[in-house]
Design a protein with these regions (language model features):
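Juxtamembrane loop-to-helix connectors within ABC transporter transmembrane domains
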Residues: 31-76, 133, 161
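Helix-to-loop junction immediately C-terminal to a conserved catalytic motif
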Residues: 307
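Cytosolic ends of transmembrane helices, especially the final helix of ABC transmembrane type-1 domains
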Residues: 120, 124, 139-143, 167-170, ...
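Loop segments that connect adjacent transmembrane helices in multi-pass transporters
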Residues: 24, 28-29, 33-45, 116-164, ...
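Primarily ABC-family ATPase nucleotide-binding module
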Residues: 239-290, 323-325, 364, 368, ...
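A hydrophobic transmembrane-helix motif
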Residues: 1-2, 64-107, 163-210
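Conserved ABC transporter NBD signature motif
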Residues: 315-322, 332
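ABC-family ATPase nucleotide-binding domain "signature/switch" substructure
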Residues: 301, 334-342, 353, 360, ...
Length: 494
């Protein structure tokens, strides 16, 4: 009783300490991983993997303490068996050896089952996350029944592993019970054959029973032990991934705005085609650059490379005198205002959605950023103004309003460089014109990807991409006069 109480108190105390430190460390490590890592793992699956960390810590703690205590007690009971019944020791050890064999077989089978369960549970979590994130699309297309059927297929595969264990597992459980009954009969028969005194038999039986109980306790720990390896395998991608931030990488405190792209090449897969093919480009500080091209020409990929979200297979990118591959990318991105196609709003209020890139910003700064994004008048008409509640995914705001909030977020930190990737695609012509005029007035370096040519009409230079390399470059008027790829794209919009 005292040992059990001590064991339980120790498990609770240690588990709280381990959970606190491990969860903090894992979450901090996950935030330091590169964007490429997150693009390869679904958000729901990552959430499930991180939740597995707490489960894993608890199981390791409980398994080590439980199995360790059982092993210590087994040694004590073995000494008692040796003292009171040496003639009975051989059959007793034979029974215990059979129990250990069943434990090993149960562990191997349970580990295999738990590995499948952990994998399918992560897949189910990812599916649920994606379904709830896209619930409007499911409702819009009337696909509730199909979505539920797909979820049910995933859930059935997961539940079958738990509620309908494989035949060997059930056989092992039955053999364990039969072994206990058969062992007792064998010990009693050996007692009669060896003429063991009743007092010694009672002492031996008591010790053997307690040793068997200790083995049964180890058997109860076995399901937890079997889950340790699958859970560890599930979090292994996070543990093995190389953090994006290097400890000794130089910090970027300020940028002049110059960008140099030298012989840059990139592909997403080793055997895939080059998305960026030996591209070189020089951007002067304060220059206003527009990038256009047909779909799939590499515009967004180039933007991801400029931000360090992807690593090129050859070539390099330089900001002023800093090589992107060798600087602290987090400090660099703080000097860049960025609005990507995949940008999204956070649950909270409008003010904190805008100032998340500039925690020091005041309400006056937020209003100025909204003015630059041509959204200030819309927000003033809202009853709660900057305190307007933003729900998940920005429901309640139009597509154009969401984009302008993201533009305000990119501008509020007064960045040295601005990157926009289709940042005004959902805006009406009037709002788009106002945003474009405000961008024209900025003195920082601006790189804008746009299909709508009115957005980049006044750029200092327009870069036309085709199949991952620069096909044309020049001002709007120069490119139109060439009657090449740019003029072809332009005429399609007339």
């Amino acid at each position: 009783m005292l040992l059990t109480l001590t064991r339980n108190l120790y498990i609770i105390r240690v588990q709280h300490i381990v959970d606190l430190h491990t969860q903090n460390a894992m979450m901090a490590r996950t935030f330091l991983l590169s964007p490429t890592f997150f693009s390869k793992h679904a958000s729901g699956e990552l959430t499930a993997k991180l939740n597995n960390v707490a489960t894993l810590c608890g199981m390791i703690n409980e398994t080590i303490i439980g199995a360790g205590l059982s092993a210590i007690l087994s040694l004590i009971y073995f000494l008692q068996l040796w003292i009171y019944g040496r003639p009975l020791l051989f059959p007793a050890m034979g029974i215990i050896a059979c129990q250990l064999l069943l434990l090993v077989l149960t562990y191997r089978r349970s580990s295999h089952t738990q590995s499948k369960y952990t994998e399918r549970a992560a897949r189910l979590s990812g599916l649920e996350y994606n379904m709830f994130a896209g619930i409007q699309k499911i409702k819009l297309t009337g696909s509730e029944e199909r979505a539920f059927t797909r979820w049910l297929d995933f859930y059935t595969d997961e539940a079958r592993l738990i509620y309908n264990p494989a035949l060997p597992t059930r056989v092992y459980q039955a053999l364990t019970a039969l072994l206990g009954i058969g062992g007792t009969m064998l010990i009693f028969w050996s007692t009669l054959s060896n003429h063991i005194a009743p007092s010694d038999y009672i002492a031996f039986s008591s010790a053997f029973g307690m040793m068997t109980a200790a083995m049964a306790q180890m058997n109860s720990v076995m399901p937890s032990l079997a889950r340790v390896k699958p859970l560890l395998d599930s979090v292994r991608p996070i543990l093995l991934a190389v953090p994006e931030m290097e400890a000794k990488a130089p910090q970027v405190e300020e940028l002049l705005g110059g960008i140099e792209i030298s012989d840059l090449s990139f592909r997403y897969q080793e055997d895939g085609p080059l998305v960026i093919d030996d591209l070189s480009l020089h951007i002067k500080p304060g220059e206003y650059i527009g990038i256009v091209g047909k779909s799939g020409c590499g515009k967004s990929t180039l933007m991801r490379l400029l931000l360090g979200f992807e690593k090129p297979i050859s070539g390099g990118i330089y900001y002023d005198n800093f090589e992107l591959a060798k600087v602290d990318k987090t400090s660099l991105r703080r000097r860049i205002g960025c609005c990507l196609q995949s940008g999204s709003l956070f649950t909270g209020d409008l003010f904190h959605n805008i100032t998340i890139t500039a925690p020091w910003a005041t309400q006056e700064d937020a209003w100025e950023a909204l003015r630059m994004a041509s959204l200030d008048e819309d927000v003033r008409r809202m009853p709660m103004g900057l305190n307007t509640v933003v729900s998940e995914n920005g429901n309640g705001f139009s597509g154009g309003q969401k984009q302008r909030i993201l533009i305000a977020r990119a501008l509020i930190s007064k960045p040295d460089i601005i990157f926009f990737d289709e940042a005004t695609s959902a805006l009406d012509n009037i709002s788009q014109k106002q945003v474009a005029e405000n961008l024209d007035k900025l003195k920082c370096t601006r790189v804008v990807i746009a299909q709508r040519l009115s957005t980049i009409r006044h750029c200092d230079r327009i870069i036309v991409l085709d199949k991952g390399h620069i096909a044309e470059e020049g001002t709007y008027e120069e490119l139109m006069a060439k009657k090449g790829l740019f003029s072809e794209i332009a005429f399609r919009q007339l």
